[in-house]
């Protein structure tokens, strides 16, 4: 679970692996948002609850298809009055004031693992590609390696440095790209 403080509010982002559409056994989220094909093929569900003085004042759940995701420290981020969240193949951007959906975008063909703020934009590390999004959810560029962007030997597969991003793929090839998505080197 991720917790954020926003003004006098606490925002919780949690994994909901047992959430089932139309079930009465779920927490009753006030809003539901779906990625592409998520109503037919839901893979992951992540809940957002907003608390004021230990009372839930608003909530929503996001549901998406693609590879399964969980909640970890870089699966979501708070950017001023917006919450950005990776759920399966989709990034959702919610307005904190009322948990309305500002935008959603399919940022990877498989799974969106992580999201980071980079100046006025966002960088996502996905299973198949690295994607740069602008503040309105438009894709600025995508970069894919020769294989899945995961490491089998516990090497750090994704690292943002001051001058670019280092990525390691499944075949242990390392790439460095700049913040415009251009390849600097491949080893």
Outline where the language-model segments fall.
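Repeated scaffold domains used in trafficking and secretory/extracellular systems
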Residues: 8-10, 14-30, 35-37, 65-80, ...
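Short loop/turn segments that connect beta-strands within the blades of beta-propeller domains
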Residues: 44, 79-80, 87-89, 118-119, ...
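Aromatic (tryptophan-biased) beta-strands that constitute blades/sheets of beta-rich domains
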Residues: 56-67, 101-111, 138-150, 185-187
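Extracellular-facing segments of soluble proteins and assemblies that are Gly/Ser/Thr-biased and enriched
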Residues: 76-106
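WD40 beta-propeller blade core
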Residues: 92-93, 131, 175
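Short loop/turn segments that connect beta-strands within beta-propeller blades
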Residues: 96-98, 134-138, 178-182
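Acidic, small-residue rich beta-repeat scaffolds with periodic aromatic anchors
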Residues: 157-187
């Amino acid at each position: 679970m991720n917790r954020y403080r926003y003004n006098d509010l606490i925002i919780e982002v949690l994994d909901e692996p047992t959430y089932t559409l139309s079930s009465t056994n779920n927490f009753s989220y006030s809003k539901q948002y779906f990625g592409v094909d998520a109503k037919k093929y839901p893979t992951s569900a992540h809940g957002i609850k907003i608390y004021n003085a230990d009372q839930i004042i608003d909530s929503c759940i996001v549901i998406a298809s693609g590879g399964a995701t969980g909640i970890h420290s870089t699966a979501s981020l708070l950017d001023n009055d917006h919450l950005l969240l990776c759920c399966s193949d989709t990034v959702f951007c919610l307005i904190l004031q009322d948990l309305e959906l500002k935008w959603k975008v399919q940022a990877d063909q498989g799974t969106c693992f992580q999201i980071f703020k980079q100046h006025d934009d966002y960088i996502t590390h996905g299973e198949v590609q690295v994607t740069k999004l602008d503040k309105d959810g438009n894709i600025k560029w995508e970069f894919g390696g020769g294989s899945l962007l995961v490491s089998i030997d516990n090497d750090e597969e994704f690292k943002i440095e001051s001058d670019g991003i280092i990525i390691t793929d499944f075949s242990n090839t390392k790439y460095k790209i700049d913040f415009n998505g251009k390849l600097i080197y491949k080893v």
